[in-house]
Swiss-Prot record:
GO terms classed as biological process: nitrogen fixation
Organism encoding this protein: Rhodopseudomonas palustris (strain HaA2)
Keyword field: Nitrogen fixation
KW Methyltransferase (keyword) present: no
Top-level taxonomic group: Bacteria
Similarity comment: family membership: Belongs to the CowN family.
Listed name of the protein: N(2)-fixation sustaining protein CowN
Role description: Is required to sustain N(2)-dependent growth in the presence of low levels of carbon monoxide (CO). Probably acts by protecting the N(2) fixation ability of the nitrogenase complex, which is inactivated in the presence of CO.
Length: 92
């Protein structure tokens, strides 16, 4: 097989990159608050997964979906949770 494979070809016109970036931007406030050790771990893993494995934010979010969902529920961040769940239903 020559060339690169675009696993997101079925996501054409879904705006998945922007939607993933928006969720990550909202998660940044939790990372910055550092109220839970997971957030520092998540921030570091995001960097590692992007740099070493070439994973995009949608894949990083998918990898940590259950934990993110639980923490967002616990923190009462229902707007970010809704955005994350929309990504899950439509793109993951």
């Amino acid at each position: 097989m020559s060339g690169s494979f675009d696993r997101y070809v079925s996501f054409k016109n879904s705006n998945w990159e922007v939607r993933s970036e928006r969720v990550m931007a909202r998660l940044q406030k939790h990372i910055d608050a550092a109220e839970n050790p997971f957030w520092a771990y998540f921030a570091q893993k995001r960097i590692e997964l992007r740099e070493k494995q070439g994973l995009d934010d949608l894949r990083v979010l998918h990898n940590y979906l259950p934990t993110l969902r639980e923490l967002l529920e616990d923190n009462g961040d229902l707007e970010t949770l809704a955005m994350l769940e929309e990504l899950e239903v439509t793109l993951m």
